[in-house]
């Protein structure tokens, strides 16, 4: 099968990676192929259904593939690790999709690499299917994200903390896998030439319009800050908690990447944490905008030598961008909140209107997704909204203020903005448990709903319901991939 690889990272950035083969797997089996994505990439889904097990397990890579493990560093929970890198993933190449966009293809769970740090480099079935589901859920919500092209069972049992688990490999598609941590890797070694080469490559690939800017590296820093501020605002608007916002998990492209311990919040609480390793709540839902700025500061540090030859002037230039991050984020968040609330135009009191609703939701632990969805019905009838609040009168004073700001077509706009279906934790776990037992039908049904999250259907009612009382209080997620 022809993939038409054009591997610019391997060609232009020698020394930024290690050539490495995928580990052998005993009995690969294609579990799921993302046929719409395959077509978007200009690939033949029917042919991939037949040959995908061999290709996406790394057993028989297509002609032109160049498997490599990328080097990067990163701050993990605030502590700097000078060498991380692809410890269980291989970039196999780049292709141009039907829209003319360059896309990375990466095998995740393909075995040990020189960056594995003692781990086996493999991925278990559950985490692979989880990333597939959540990535497609984010895509359905219109949020920039990496996506899964395929999931392959390897036929190899893996020993994990919870016992023996079947092995699997995810084929991930991304605009690129360049991270803040990629810049940090070379900056930590004072290799300014490679920091510059990486910046030039990232500009050419993601922000080509900046190449002719008076100060292209400063413009690049600003563009990444803008892309990430918009991304995190969109996470917050759907109640998404990434769970591990380390600098090696922040892309230069502005895509969401690495769905290890992520989850969607149900009852609204800014302190919500699901990740089993986030013991201090560093990456709690409400902290994500602050971590956004913290991570961008680390990128700024790596770029300082490119911003100006004079250290003081370079710092001032970096700070001039950093000082805008809060306003950038708030602007995107407020614009999104106005859309969620169906407001007409923009008025000064809109932020207070939104914050007062959130305060009531927090006090009542109201479900994030259903509250905004049922507000569309509350334009004319609040009968389905009130039961979401323990005190039915909690919004008594707020509703008239909100209705006074509504656009004429508010209900229609709100239904197109506020999803009815998200990847609720209990439904994800049910689908994964069934998959472990050999039944992928629940996975497929959930995936179908998540691909069309704004269209409410009677036969999908179960996917809209919150978890049983107390489920999320004890629910924990893990870095499985």
Curated annotation (Swiss-Prot):
Listed cofactors: Mg(2+); Mn(2+)
Coiled coil segments of this chain: none
Alphabetical keyword list: ATP-binding, Magnesium, Manganese, Metal-binding, Nucleotide-binding, Nucleotidyltransferase, Transferase
Residues where Mg(2+) binds: 249, 258
Record keyword Nucleotidyltransferase present: yes
Residues involved in ATP binding: 85, 87-88, 108, 120-121, 172, 179, 258
Superkingdom, taxonomy of origin: Bacteria
EC number: 2.7.7.-, 2.7.7.108
Signal peptide: none
GO function term, MF aspect, one: ATP binding
InterPro entries found in the cross-reference section: SelO
Catalytic residues, chain numbering: 248
ATP-binding is among the record's keywords: yes
Catalytic activity annotation: L-seryl-[protein] + ATP = 3-O-(5'-adenylyl)-L-seryl-[protein] + diphosphate; L-threonyl-[protein] + ATP = 3-O-(5'-adenylyl)-L-threonyl-[protein] + diphosphate; L-tyrosyl-[protein] + ATP = O-(5'-adenylyl)-L-tyrosyl-[protein] + diphosphate; L-histidyl-[protein] + UTP = N(tele)-(5'-uridylyl)-L-histidyl-[protein] + diphosphate
Known role: Nucleotidyltransferase involved in the post-translational modification of proteins. It can catalyze the addition of adenosine monophosphate (AMP) or uridine monophosphate (UMP) to a protein, resulting in modifications known as AMPylation and UMPylation.
HAMAP family: YdiU_SelO
Family: Belongs to the SELO family.
Matching NCBIfam families: PRK00029.1
Name of the protein in its database record: Protein nucleotidyltransferase YdiU
Highest classification ranks of the organism: Bacteria, Pseudomonadati, Pseudomonadota, Alphaproteobacteria, Rhodobacterales
Gene label: ydiU
């Amino acid at each position: 099968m022809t993939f038409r690889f054009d591997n610019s990272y391997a060609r232009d950035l020698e020394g930024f990676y290690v050539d490495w083969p995928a580990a052998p797997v005993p009995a690969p089996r294609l579990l799921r192929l993302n046929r719409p994505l395959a077509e978007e990439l200009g690939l033949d889904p029917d042919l991939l259904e037949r040959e995908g097990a061999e290709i996406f397990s790394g057993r028989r890579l297509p002609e032109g593939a160049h498997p490599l493990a990328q080097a990067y560093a990163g701050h993990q929970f605030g502590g700097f690790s000078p060498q991380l890198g692809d410890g269980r993933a291989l970039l196999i190449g780049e292709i141009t999709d039907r829209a003319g966009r360059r896309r990375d293809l990466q095998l995740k769970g393909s075995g040990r690499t020189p960056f594995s740090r003692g781990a086996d480099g493999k991925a278990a079935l559950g985490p692979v299917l989880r990333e597939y589901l959540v990535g497609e859920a984010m895509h359905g919500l219109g949020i920039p994200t990496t996506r899964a092209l395929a999931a392959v069972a390897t036929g190899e049992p893996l020993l994990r903390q919870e016992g023996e688990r079947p092995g699997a490999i995810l084929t991930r598609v991304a605009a690129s896998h360049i991270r803040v941590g990629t810049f940090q890797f070379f900056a930590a070694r004072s290799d300014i030439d490679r920091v510059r080469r990486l910046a030039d490559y990232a500009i050419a690939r993601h922000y080509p319009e900046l190449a002719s800017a008076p100060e292209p590296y400063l413009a690049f820093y600003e563009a990444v800050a803008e892309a990430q501020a918009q991304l995190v605002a969109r996470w917050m608007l759907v109640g998404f908690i990434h769970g591990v916002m380390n600098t090696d998990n922040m892309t230069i492209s502005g895509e969401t990447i690495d769905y290890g311990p992520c989850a969607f919040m149900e009852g609204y609480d800014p302190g919500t944490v699901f990740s089993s390793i986030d013991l201090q709540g560093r990456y709690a839902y409400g902290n994500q905008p602050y971590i956004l700025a913290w991570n961008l500061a680390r990128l700024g540090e790596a770029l300082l030598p490119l911003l100006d030859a004079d250290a003081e002037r370079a710092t001032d230039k970096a700070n001039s961008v950093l000082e805008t991050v809060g306003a950038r984020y708030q602007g995107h968040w407020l614009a999104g909140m106005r859309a969620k609330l169906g407001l007409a135009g923009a008025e000064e009191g809109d932020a207070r209107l939104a914050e007062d609703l959130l305060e009531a939701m927090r006090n009542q632990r109201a479900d994030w997704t259903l509250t905004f969805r049922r507000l569309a019905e509350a334009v004319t009838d609040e009968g389905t909204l009130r039961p979401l609040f323990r005190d039915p009168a909690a919004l008594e004073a707020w509703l008239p203020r909100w209705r006074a700001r509504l656009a004429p077509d508010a209900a229609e706009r709100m239904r197109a903005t506020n999803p009815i279906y998200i990847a609720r934790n209990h439904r994800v776990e049910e689908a994964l448990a069934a998959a472990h037992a050999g039944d992928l039908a629940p996975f497929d049904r959930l995936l179908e709903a998540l691909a069309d999250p704004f269209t409410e259907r009677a036969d999908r009612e179960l996917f809209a319901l919150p978890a049983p009382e107390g489920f999320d209080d004890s629910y924990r997620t893990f870095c499985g991939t």
